[in-house]
A protein has these predicted regions:
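Mid-length scaffold segments of soluble, non-membrane domains
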Residues: 71-104
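Protein maturation boundaries and topogenic segments
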Residues: 1-75, 123, 144-159
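Short, surface-exposed secondary-structure boundary micro-motifs
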Residues: 43, 57, 93, 100, ...
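Solvent-exposed loop/turn segments at secondary-structure junctions
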Residues: 44, 88, 95, 137-138
Length: 159
């Protein structure tokens, strides 16, 4: 009987490692989105203007954690600014979507450290989105570029 219990516990641990449960609620303390508690719904169809919960793209996750922008295991609350098929450009300090300026990038953070600066123009692929925060100091797609659908956990609705 104990062996069956251990086997079940082991299977549960393996399943958890393979299928990470997504957060159901997120408490946002960042000024880049309205403060408060958000409920997370399944991914579903994502549209421009939606608020989503997303992981910092893997390339920037550890970097952002080291700078103490956001802990590596804490998701972001961001607005979907551009969707698949949109043209996104980052030229100098200006970020444009479909030829319209939508965000300004800072060259350095509040401590004087250089910020990342992806640059150029791209048309977002079928599983790419540009996520932006509402505040000018938001750490978001203006610095790390498009976010893949796999990093979007779900839509967020503020309670």
């Amino acid at each position: 009987m104990a062996g069956a219990g251990l086997a079940l516990l082991g299977a549960a641990a393996v399943l958890d490692a393979i299928v990470r449960p997504s957060p159901r609620f997120v408490w946002n303390l960042s000024a880049s989105a309205p403060l408060g508690l958000y409920v997370v719904s399944s991914k579903g169809e994502i549209a421009a203007g939606d608020t989503v919960i997303a992981r910092v793209p893997a390339l920037w996750r550890l970097w952002a954690g080291r700078r103490r922008y956001i802990p590596i295991n804490v998701p972001l609350v961001k607005r979907v600014a551009a969707i698949p098929g949109d043209s996104v450009c980052a030229i100098g300090t200006l970020v444009q979507i479909n030829g319209r300026g939508v965000a300004i990038r800072r060259l350095s953070d509040g401590r004087g450290r250089d910020m990342p600066d992806w640059h150029g123009c791209t048309t977002l692929g079928q599983r790419e989105y540009l996520l932006l925060g509402d505040g000018p100091d938001s750490f978001d797609g203006r610095y790390f570029g498009p976010t893949g659908r796999n990093d979007i956990i779900g839509k967020a609705h503020r309670l």
